[in-house]
Curated annotation (Swiss-Prot):
InterPro entries hit by this protein: WD40/YVTN_repeat-like_dom_sf (IPR015943), WD40_repeat_CS (IPR019775), WD40_repeat_dom_sf (IPR036322), WD40_rpt (IPR001680), WDHD1/CFT4_beta-prop_2nd (IPR022100), WDHD1/CFT4_hel (IPR048591)
Record keywords: Nucleus, Repeat, WD repeat
One Pfam family this sequence matches: Ctf4_C
Phenotype when the gene is knocked out: Enhances phenotypes of the lhp1-3 mutant, thus leading to reduced plant size, early flowering in all photoperiod conditions and altered leaf morphology, associated with an increased expression of H3K27me3-positive genes.
Name of the protein described by the UniProt record: Protein ENHANCER OF LHP1 1
Motif Nuclear localization signal, residue numbers: 900-907
Quaternary context: Interacts with EZA1/SWN, LHP1, SLD5 and CLF in the nucleus.
Lyase is among the record's keywords: no
Acidic residues compositional bias, start-end: 349-359
Source superkingdom: Eukaryota
Induction of the gene: Induced by the auxin analog 2,4-D.
Gene Ontology CC terms: nucleus
Length: 953
C-alpha cells in the first residue's frame, strides 16, 4: 500500500453511530453534491474553486437524506429521505421544483435514466416506482424483491434497470415490458437492517457487464444478456465490499469495503493496482468526469478527493469513454394508455391521502398544466428533428389525443392500474438453447457442440468462420477436415455418422440454413443444405439415420441422412431444446408462461424415429426458480436433465414415470467452481469443472473431463451411512431398469442371456451393500431398520449370511426375526411355484392339488438341519424377489423344459417344509452340513443355463 495522506473535510454532522453519506459530481466537474442520512440538508460544493468556499445548502427535507441522483446532463437533482419524500430540484441553482412522489416508508435509493426522463425510486416499500420527471406521474411499479431495495442502476442505453435488495438478490428488468430478464439470487452480502451499509449494482460504461459486490469480499461481473457470471475481482479486501464505481472509460473500478480500504482495480488484468486505508468506512465514491481523481465520503460525513490515483504510466480514466446514446422514453416504454392513466390516478389518490407539504409542492392542477406544456414542447422539438431528417411525426394534438384515448374510453375502469402493476412482475420464458454449445465470443473459439463422442468448435476469421470437428478418441471416429463457414452457424450436433449445423435468421436476405455433413458415404456430394423462409431453426439433433430441426414455427422437421424430408410435426409450444440418441429424439417445449414464482413450465416428448412412435411424454422437473441448462441421454439410454441450480435428474418408469434427482452440486461443489455437464452413466457424471466461476468452458486450453460419483440429495440420517444408502438406491434403480429391459426383450422373443447375467451381478452387488447397511444398523441399535433391510435381500445365501452376521454380533432376538423372514420367503416361493408351475401327469394333464394353500409355520428359531433341508428342496428355485424385482417372462417361456427336469414334485416340497423341527437353539444356525451344501451346489450347476442360479455372495 502506498504511503500517502488524504485530508478529509467535514460536510455533515454525524452523531455517534455511522450514517450513509452520498457524494456526486456533475457532468462538467464544476460542482459536487453531498448528503447524509443523519442530516436533512443537502450541500452543493464548488468544484472549481481552489479555496474553501461555503457550499450552497438545500433544506427541504424533514429528516436525513438517504439518496441523491443527478441526471446525465446535470440539470435535475433528486433527493430521497427518511421522511418518505422524493424531491426534485433544478441544478446547480438548487431551486426546488416539486415533491415528485411519496412512499409510506423511508426511501433508500434513486436513479435517473440516461435521458433524464425517468426517475427510479425505491426503499423499504414494496416495489420500484418509475416516475415521469416531466409531470410526476408514475408510469410503472416493478415488484419482485423480497426485501428493501438498496441499489438501482439504469443501463447506459436505458433499456434495462438493475436492482438489488438487502438479501443480496439482483433483478434485471426489461423496461419495455416490465418483466425480469434474469435473477441472481443471494449473490451479494446480506446487509440486514443496517441502513448505513448498502448493496449496489453498477453497469459498466459500455453496458456489457454488471458489477455486483460478491460474497467473498470481491466484485463479481455478470453478463448483460444472460446474467451468467463472467469473472470476479478479488484482492486485499478483508471484509465485504460496500460500494463500487466505474471509471468513465470502464478500464478501472474503485471499491470500498467494511475494512475501511479503497482499492483501485485494472478490470482487464483482474488485479488491484493501488489502495488507500482510511480512518472510517468509505460509504460512497464518485469519479471526476474530466480528471484522474476520485471523490470519497466516509460514514462520519467527511469528504475528500483522491488525486492522481491511476499511475501516469497507465491509460487515463478519461481516455476512450464509450459514447452510448440512450434511447428516448417512448422508444423504451411501451405502456398501455389505460394502465398509465390508472396508475397516474392511483398516485394522485395517494398524494391526496398524504396531504401537501408546506415547502412549495405543486398541486395536481399545476402538474396537469406542466404535463400539457411539456408534451407540446417535446413534440415540437421532435418535429424539428424529424423535419431535418426528411420524415414526419404526428402533431402535438394527435399525440395528446392518443395518450388520453384509453382514459376517455375506460373512464371507470379503476382495476386497470392493479392489472398493470401485476403484469409488471411477469417472468420471461427461457430461450431455446443447444445442448453442449457455448455463447459466441468475439475473437475466441467457442463450442458449437460438445458431448461424450467429440466436439465441434468455431472461430470467426476475416468475415467467415472456421469450423473444426474433433473426436475425443481418435480411433473411434474418422479424421474430419476443417470447414469454412459462410453461413455463421451457431449450433451443431454430432454422432458417429455425421454432424448437423444451423444458423439463426439474419434478415430477409440471410435465411436460416440447416446443413448436414456425413463422415462416411459411398456417394460423392453427400453434404446437403435446407433453407427456411419465414421460420428460424432453434435447435438441431441427429441420430441413427435421421436429422431433426425444430423451428420458430413450433415445427419438428425430420430428414433422412441423405436429405429426404420425411416427417413434419407440430409441437405444443415453443421449443427449449432437443437431443438425439440412436433411434430416439427428445424434445423439450414450453407448456405455458412462467409461474408467478418464476418457475418454468416445460414438457418433454421422446420419439422413436424408426418406429414413428412417441414412447414418453411428461413434464420437466426443475428446481424452483431455476432454468434448464442441459438435456441428454445416459450411456444406458435414460433421459436426463440438469438445471441451473446444479441438480441432475434421470427419468425412470417407476411410479408411472418420474424424475429422480441423482446428483446435486450443493454438496459436491467446490469454491469458485461450476460444473458444465457433458454426459453420465449409471454411477458417474462426466462434466467440465469451470474455474473462477465461469459458466462455460474455454476451447483453449483444452478442457479436462471431470468424473464425479452420482450422489443423491439425501437427508442427514442418524445411521451415519449416507454413502451406503446412496449406493443402495442407485443399484436398485439400475436393477429395476435392467429387469424391465429383460421383460421387454423376452416379450418379443429376443435373447436375454446377457442382460440376465448383468441383472444377477447387480443382485449380488446390491445384497453386499445391504449386508453392510445391516451391520451399520446393528452397531447403532436400529434393529427395526435392519429387519427392513433383511426383507430387501434378494438371494437366499445372502439372507443366511445376514443371520450368521447378527448371530456373531450376539443378537439372538434379531437372528430369530431374520430366520422367520427367511422361512416366510421360502414358503412364499414354494407357494408361487405351485401356482405358476402346476404338476403334470404322464399324460400331460394337470394334477389337481388337494392343498392349495400352505400354512406358515410359527416364527421361531430354526436349526441348521431344518434350514439345510429347505435349501435342498429349493435348490432349483430362482433367487428370491425384492421390491424392485419382477417375475421373469423368460422363465415362463421355458416352463415345459423346466417341468420335465424336476427331481421332486411341489407337493413333496411343501410337505417337507411343514415337517421342519422348530425346537433346536439358534446357535445351530451356524452349523452347515457340507455334504448337503455340496449336493445343493451340484444341483445349481446342473441349471447353469439360468443366470440367476449362479454362485452368490
Amino acid at each position: 500500500m502506498k504511503s500517502r495522506s488524504l485530508k478529509l473535510r467535514e460536510a455533515h454532522k454525524v452523531g455517534g453511530s455511522a450514517a450513509f453519506c452520498s457524494i456526486l459530481w456533475d457532468h462538467k466537474a464544476e460542482h459536487f453534491v453531498t448528503s447524509s442520512s443523519s442530516d436533512p440538508s443537502i450541500s452543493v460544493h464548488d468544484g472549481l474553486s481552489t479555496s474553501t468556499l461555503p457550499p450552497t445548502i438545500l433544506r427541504h427535507h424533514q429528516d436525513g437524506v438517504t439518496s441523491l441522483a443527478l441526471s446525465n446532463d446535470s440539470t435535475l437533482l433528486a433527493s430521497g429521505s427518511i421522511d418518505h419524500c422524493v424531491k426534485l430540484y433544478k441544478f446547480p441553482s438548487g431551486e426546488f421544483q416539486t415533491n415528485i412522489t411519496r412512499f409510506t416508508l423511508p426511501i433508500r435509493v434513486l436513479a435517473f435514466n440516461g435521458s433524464g426522463s425517468l426517475l427510479a425510486a425505491a426503499g423499504d416499500d414494496e416495489g420500484i416506482k418509475l416516475i415521469n420527471t416531466f409531470d410526476g406521474s408514475i408510469v410503472r411499479v416493478l415488484k419482485g424483491h423480497k426485501g428493501p431495495v438498496t441499489g438501482l442502476d439504469f443501463h447506459p442505453n436505458g433499456e434495462l434497470l438493475a436492482s438489488i435488495d438487502t438479501t443480496g438478490t439482483v433483478l434485471c428488468w426489461e423496461l419495455q415490458n416490465g418483466v425480469v430478464s434474469f435473477t441472481l439470487k443471494g449473490v451479494a452480502p446480506d446487509t440486514g437492517f443496517n441502513t448505513s451499509i448498502v448493496n449496489i449494482p453498477r453497469w459498466s460504461p459500455d453496458g456489457r457487464t454488471l458489477a455486483v459486490p460478491g460474497l467473498r469480499n470481491d466484485v463479481v461481473m455478470y453478463d448483460r444478456f444472460t446474467g451468467e457470471k463472467l469473472f470476479a475481482l478479488r484482492g486485499d479486501h478483508l471484509e465485504a465490499i460496500c460500494y463500487l464505481t466505474w471509471a468513465p472509460n470502464g478500464k478501472y473500478i474503485a471499491t470500498s469495503g467494511l475494512d475501511k480500504q479503497v482499492l483501485l482495480w485494472d478490470v482487464d488484468k483482474k488485479q488491484d493496482i493501488d489502495r488507500h486505508k482510511f480512518e472510517e468506512r468509505i460509504c460512497c465514491m464518485s469519479w471526476k468526469p474530466n480528471g484522474n481523481a476520485l471523490s470519497v465520503i466516509d460514514a462520519k460525513g467527511r469528504y475528500g478527493v483522491w488525486e492522481s490515483l491511476v499511475p501516469s504510466s497507465m491509460l487515463s480514466p478519461t481516455v476512450g469513454v464509450p459514447d452510448i446514446v440512450p434511447k428516448k422514453r417512448n422508444e423504451i416504454l411501451d405502456f398501455d394508455d389505460e394502465v398509465e392513466e390508472e396508475i397516474y390516478r392511483a398516485s394522485e389518490s395517494l398524494d391526496d391521502a398524504m396531504g401537501d407539504s408546506d415547502d412549495g409542492e405543486s398541486h395536481h392542477t399545476s402538474r396537469k398544466r406542466l404535463r400539457k406544456k411539456t408534451l407540446i414542447d417535446e413534440d415540437v422539438d421532435d418535429a424539428y428533428e424529424e423535419l431535418n431528417d426528411g420524415s414526419s411525426l404526428p402533431s402535438a394534438s394527435e399525440y395528446r389525443k392518443k395518450s388520453h384515448r384509453g382514459h376517455r374510453e375506460k373512464q371507470g375502469a379503476r382495476s386497470g392500474a392493479f392489472k398493470g402493476i401485476s403484469a409488471s412482475t411477469k417472468y420471461k420464458m427461457q430461450s431455446s438453447f443447444q445442448p453442449g454449445a457455448t455463447p459466441p465470443e468475439p475473437g475466441k473459439r467457442t463450442f458449437l457442440c460438445y458431448n461424450m463422442l467429440g466436439c465441434i468448435t468455431t472461430i470467426e476469421h476475416e468475415g467467415n468462420s472456421r469450423i473444426e470437428t474433433d473426436f475425443h478418441d481418435t480411433g473411434r471416429g474418422p479424421r474430419v477436415s476443417s470447414m469454412i463457414d459462410i453461413y455463421g452457424f451457431t449450433m451443431a450436433s454430432i454422432n458417429e455418422t455425421g454432424c448437423v449445423f444451423a444458423n439463426p435468421c439474419k434478415g430477409e436476405k440471410n435465411m436460416s440454413v440447416l446443413m448436414y455433413r456425413p463422415f462416411r458415404s459411398w456417394a460423392s456430394n453427400s453434404e446437403w443444405t435446407m433453407r427456411f423462409e419465414g421460420e428460424e431453426v432453434k435447435v438441431v439433433a441427429n441420430g441413427s439415420g435421421w436429422v431433426a430441426a425444430v423451428t420458430s414455427l413450433n415445427l419438428l422437421r425430420v430428414f433422412s441422412e441423405g436429405g429426404l424430408q420425411k416427417h413434419i410435426l407440430s409441437l405444443d409450444g415453443p421449443v427449449v431444446t432437443a437431443v438425439g440418441c440412436k433411434d430416439h429424439l427428445a424434445v423439450v417445449t414450453h407448456v405455458s408462461d412462467c409461474l408467478p414464482s418464476n418457475e418454468q413450465v416445460m414438457e418433454f416428448r421422446v420419439f422413436n424415429i424408426s418406429k414413428m412412435t412417441q414412447e414418453l411424454k411428461g413434464r420437466v422437473a426443475l428446481t424452483p426458480g431455476s432454468r434448464l441448462t442441459w438435456i441428454g441421454f445416459s450411456e444406458e439410454g435414460s433421459l436426463s436433465s440438469y438445471d441451473s441450480e446444479g441438480v441432475l435428474r434421470v427419468f425412470t418408469s417407476q411410479y408411472g414415470g418420474s424424475w429422480i434427482p441423482v446428483f446435486s452440486t450443493s454438496k459436491e461443489k467446490k469454491q469458485e467452481e461450476n460444473y458444465w455437464v457433458v454426459g453420465l452413466n449409471t454411477s458417474s457424471l462426466y462434466c467440465i469443472a469451470c474455474k473462477y466461476a465461469e459458466m462455460f468452458p474455454q476451447v483453449t486450453p483444452k478442457p479436462i473431463l471431470t468424473i464425479l460419483d452420482l450422489s443423491l440429495p439425501l437427508a442427514s440420517s442418524d445411521l451415519g451411512a449416507a454413502s451406503l444408502e446412496n449406493e443402495l438406491i442407485l443399484k436398485q434403480l439400475r436393477l429395476y431398469e435392467t429387469q424391465r429391459k429383460v421383460d421387454d426383450m423376452a416379450l418379443v422373443g429376443v435373447d436375454t442371456t446377457a442382460l440376465e447375467d448383468e441383472a444377477f451381478d447387480l443382485e449380488v452387488s446390491q445384497d453386499k451393500c445391504i449386508l453392510r447397511l445391516i451391520s451399520s444398523c446393528c452397531s447403532s441399535d436400529s434393529f427395526a431398520r435392519a429387519s427392513e433391510l433383511m426383507e430387501l435381500l434378494t438371494l437366499e445365501k445372502s439372507m443366511r449370511a445376514a443371520i450368521t452376521l447378527v448371530t456373531k454380533l450376539k443378537l439372538p432376538f434379531l437372528a430369530e426375526k431374520f430366520s422367520s423372514i427367511l422361512e416366510e420367503r421360502l414358503l412364499e416361493e414354494a407357494s408361487e411355484a405351485a401356482v405358476t408351475n402346476p404338476a403334470l401327469n404322464p399324460n400331460g394333464e394337470v394334477v389337481t392339488r388337494v392343498e392349495s394353500k400352505v400354512q406358515n409355520p410359527p416364527a421361531s428359531i430354526q436349526t441348521s438341519e431344518n434350514t439345510e433341508a429347505v435349501m435342498k428342496s429349493s435348490a432349483t428355485k430362482l433367487s428370491a424377489p425384492t421390491l424392485l424385482k419382477k417375475s421373469k417372462v423368460s422363465e415362463g417361456l421355458k416352463l415345459g423344459k423346466e417341468q420335465t427336469k424336476k427331481d421332486k414334485s411341489d407337493d413333496a416340497k411343501i410337505k417337507e417344509i411343514k415337517k421342519l423341527n422348530l425346537k433346536n437353539p439358534v446357535n445351530n444356525v451356524n452349523k452347515e452340513d457340507k455334504g448337503q451344501e455340496k449336493e445343493v451346489n451340484q444341483g445349481e450347476a446342473r441349471r447353469s443355463s439360468n443366470p440367476f442360479l449362479k454362485s452368490t455372495v
